[in-house]
Swiss-Prot record:
Reaction(s) the record says it catalyses: tRNA(Val) + L-valine + ATP = L-valyl-tRNA(Val) + AMP + diphosphate
Annotated function: Catalyzes the attachment of valine to tRNA(Val). As ValRS can inadvertently accommodate and process structurally similar amino acids such as threonine, to avoid such errors, it has a 'posttransfer' editing activity that hydrolyzes mischarged Thr-tRNA(Val) in a tRNA-dependent manner.
Gene name of this polypeptide: valS
Originating organism: Rickettsia africae (strain ESF-5)
Motif ('KMSKS' region): 536-540
NCBIfam families: PRK13208.1, valS
Main location: cytoplasm
PANTHER family tied to this protein: VALINE--TRNA LIGASE, CHLOROPLASTIC_MITOCHONDRIAL 2 (PTHR11946:SF93), VALYL-TRNA SYNTHETASES (PTHR11946)
Protein name as annotated: Valine--tRNA ligase
EC number: 6.1.1.9
Keywords: Aminoacyl-tRNA synthetase, ATP-binding, Cytoplasm, Ligase, Nucleotide-binding, Protein biosynthesis
Residue window of motif 'HIGH' region: 46-56
Length: 812
């Protein structure tokens, strides 16, 4: 008989098992297994943009609970890890780390620095993900900036061009003047800002005064019309007339339009190109001229005696207001708080510029995408409304051009050849991946083309994250079509709720456009990890928790336990109390296993190898049979919860069974029989040990998806040298049930509870002898009565049925 280790050292054991799992390739994907037997995960590729925090652990471990369960259920698991290492987030990290600015450097030099930084940052992620025991197959790793990913992303672009779902046009777009790039609607956030509503005097062409209210007087030089509501009786007389702008004396038409709010300001609104989306609508609807006065750097480009040329937006606003005051053209100012559209990354207020960009058709597909949202299995279900709300709110096609550097280039050039100037030239699929700054289109010389200098929105590549792993886009565009067909659509997309409008939406859009399908069958949405005061963790607040310190203090299994205690989709707080409970559970598992281990050498070898169903007849004691029935019920419930992605419920059920049913009750009740030092009941002893053997084995398997290290260590000490985490190791007791009256065992537990409370109230040890237990309301079988005598230290028990409810009289 081998010895049970004295203590459990989580630091040593977790490192040991992580290394063994890697060496033995426990989590390796098998490409030869049929598609129907494979479970495929579209793992979120973390953005390489900054410090690792406990939120990474929180979200990724929740996915791993489901993955480990599916593997143990017999699925061949395709569980890759990617790194979203291209695009603006990475550029901002590099600029901050290296104290540089991309636009001040040679493009190729900046890209080289980006590549060095992401390689270093990705190694930190790999280390953390291994420490928290993510059961990924690292041979499936990808980077969104790798040559293969660039090839697949460019394939996606060409496929959508071929399907006429992508177009290039010179139209108003959202522009971030800080990062110097166009943005998509999903890249913006609304911020409440204080400002002034400025009431300014215009005049009609006939010299009559008009008062117009605006928050952006600096756009006066770009004013192309003044609007009023067609039902506004105050201004109907202005129909067909013109207005003269103050300071700049430009004549612009006075026009009626139903989009004007009569109750806002004075009911007269100036239309500038461009202050907001309404300006764009009016500009298009009324065929107005274009006056561009804002540069890509967010400064004014307008030569005039007001001398606002070259000023930043805020500076120009202040100067215009001062001049209006001097010339008595500013009637009044009102303090207001209004919503301003800002860049999600830089935080800068956005401008609307007219710049040639690439767009993916989105608005025309809104109804189809709403249907796709309904076809998808949402976990939890209430997250679907977030996608539906976003789809309904979309008012722009998806702008995928970015005026940056470290990203996937467009496989595009523009011809300078005589007679076809400006013609768009696309790369041949056999050329991919290409960089138009270095490569050339087939049949053209360097002098005959102008490359597209832009790169794609990082979401344009992240939106094909399933395809980055499957190595294909469609029937016409694939690196490995057989692999793609086998893995796509995938089974699961895990992700956070705040990127439903971006990552989930764009991935669904791309799959719909490429192959008229969903990208996955299920989406599993996690919440945020909040600080203990329920505020969002942020470095500025100093409340970010670093995983390394927690891993050093508690170990991976305890942190995973904390993560498993939060329901899917719910925001949770970091809790020291939950961490301590997890540590307590690990210790209790160790001690419970140590207790049952000392009895296992009394079992026959063939009974240890047999399944619980095969040795069913050898469990003879009534309370043992009740225990097995409860175990079977637990397995069914926990399995059902995990199949429905409700890992927290499965964990709670298993933990409660372990503490209450096993440790508090069964171990104590069966202890005398298990030891049977006087050999009074060898059959009862064998029955209890066999029950303990299978109960502990089953519980370790139920805990295994959540706490992989302690369960592996105990499983190999108690049961097998094979890993507990291998494919098909889950338990299935669907055909197992003992035909017994559960009221007897439950009555025993009720009596025991009464006795325990009695002794506790009198400050007596649980082992304090009892002369007589007088029990009414139930009569236990001889086996159960014997177990009750042993656990309560009763010399004698008398039963009678005179009461409907159980009552106990205790005589010491």
């Amino acid at each position: 008989m081998k010895e049970f280790p004295k203590n459990y050292n989580f630091t040593e054991n977790e490192k040991k098992w992580q290394q063994i799992w890697q060496e033995k390739q426990i989590y390796a994907y098998n490409p030869n297994v049929a598609k129907e037997e494979t479970y495929v995960i579209d793992t979120p590729p973390p953005t390489v943009s900054g410090q690792l925090h406990i939120g990474h652990v929180y979200s990724y471990t929740q996915t791993d609970f489901i993955v480990r369960f599916q593997r143990m259920m017999g699925k061949n698991i395709f569980y890759p890890m990617g790194f979203d290492d291209n695009g603006l987030p990475t550029e901002r990290l590099v600029e901050k780390q290296k104290q540089i600015k991309a636009y001040n450097m040679d493009r190729s030099e900046f890209i080289k620095i980006c590549e060095e930084v992401v390689e270093s940052e990705e190694e930190k992620f790999r280390s953390l993900f291994n420490q928290i025991a993510l059961s990924v197959d690292w041979s499936l790793e990808y980077q969104t900036i790798s040559p293969l990913s660039r090839k697949i992303s460019q394939m996606s672009f060409l496929d959508l061009v071929q399907k006429e779902e992508i177009y290039r046009t010179n139209q108003p777009i959202l522009w971030d003047p800080v990062d110097g790039t166009a943005l998509a609607q999903a890249d913006i956030e609304d911020k409440e800002k204080t400002s002034f509503m400025n009431y300014i005097t215009f005049k009609t062409a006939q010299g009559d005064p008009l008062t117009i209210a605006t928050t952006r007087p600096e756009l006066l030089p770009a004013c192309v019309a003044v609007f009023y509501h067609p039902d506004d009786g105050r201004y109907k007389h202005l129909a067909g007339k013109s207005a003269i702008t103050p300071l700049f004396n430009e004549q612009v038409p006075l026009l009626a339009d139903p989009l004007v709010r009569q109750d806002k300001g004075t009911g007269l609104v100036m239309c500038c190109t461009f202050g907001d989306q309404t300006d764009i609508t009016w500009w298009k609807t009324h065929n107005l001229p274009l006056k561009t006065i804002i540069t890509k750097k967010g400064t004014i480009d307008f030569q005039h005696e007001t001398s606002i040329d070259g000023l930043k937006i805020k500076e120009a606003r202040t100067k215009i207001i001062d001049i209006l005051k001097e010339q008595e053209l500013l009637i009044k100012q009102e303090d207001i708080t209004h919503t301003v559209k800002c860049a999600e990354r830089s935080g800068a207020p956005l401008e609307i510029l007219t710049v040639p960009q690439w767009f993916v058709k989105t608005i025309s597909h809104k109804e189809e995408l709403l249907k796709r949202a309904n076809e998808l299995n949402w976990h939890p279900k209430n997250m679907k409304i977030r996608l539906e709300n976003w789809i309904n709110a979309i008012s722009w096609d998806w702008c995928i051009s970015r005026q940056r550097y470290f990203g996937v280039p467009f496989p595009v050039w523009y011809s300078k050849r005589v007679g076809e100037e400006g013609k768009i030239l696309y790369a041949d699929v056999t050329q991919l991946p290409i960089d138009p700054l270095k490569d050339l289109p087939v049949g053209y010389s360097k002098e005959e083309v102008e490359p597209d200098y832009d790169v794609m929105d990082t979401w344009a590549t992240s939106s094909v994250s399933p395809q980055l792993s499957t190595h294909g886009i469609s029937d016409d565009f694939a690196v490995n079509k057989d692999r793609h067909d086998k893995l796509f659509p995938m089974d699961l997309r895990p992700q956070a709720h705040e990127i439903i409008r971006t990552w989930a939406f764009y991935t669904i859009l791309k799959a719909h456009l490429h192959q008229n399908t969903l990208p996955w069958k299920n989406i599993m949405v996690n919440g945020w990890c909040l600080a203990e005061d329920r505020s969002k963790m942020s470095k500025s607040k100093g409340n970010v928790l670093v995983p390394e310190k927690l891993l050093e203090q508690y170990g991976s299994d305890v942190i995973r336990y904390w993560s498993a205690n939060s329901k899917l989709g719910a925001d949770t707080t970091y809790s020291e109390d939950v961490m301590k409970n997890g540590k307590r559970l690990v210790n209790k598992l160790w001690n419970a296993a140590k207790f049952v281990f000392i009895h296992f050498d009394k079992l026959k070898g063939e009974d240890k190898k047999a399944s619980l169903l095969d040795i069913k007849e050898k469990i003879t004691n009534e309370f043992d049979k009740w225990m097995v029935n409860k175990l079977v019920e637990l397995v069914k419930l926990a399995t059902n919860e995990l199949q429905n992605y409700e890992y927290a419920n499965a964990m709670h059920l298993t933990e409660k069974f372990f503490w209450v049913v096993l440790c508090d009750n069964y171990l104590e009740i069966s202890k005398t029989r298990s030891y049977d030092e006087e050999h009074k009941n060898p059959q009862g002893q064998y029955s209890s040990i066999l029950t303990l053997y299978h109960v502990m084995q089953t519980l370790l398997k139920l805990f295994a998806p959540f706490m992989p290290h302690i369960t592996e260590e105990l499983y190999q000490i108690l049961y097998s040298e094979n890993s507990i985490h291998v494919k098909g190791s889950w338990v299935n007791y669907s055909d197992l049930n003992y035909e017994i009256n559960a009221k007897g065992a439950e009555g025993l537990l009720e009596i025991l509870d009464i006795v325990r409370k009695f002794k506790a109230e009198k400050n007596l040890s649980i082992k304090t002898p009892i002369k007589l237990l007088e029990v009414s309301g139930i009569v236990l079988s001889a086996e159960l009565a014997e177990d009750l005598k042993n656990v309560t230290s009763a010399e004698e028990i008398q039963f009678e049925m005179k009461d409907d409810k159980i009552k106990v009289n205790i005589i010491l």
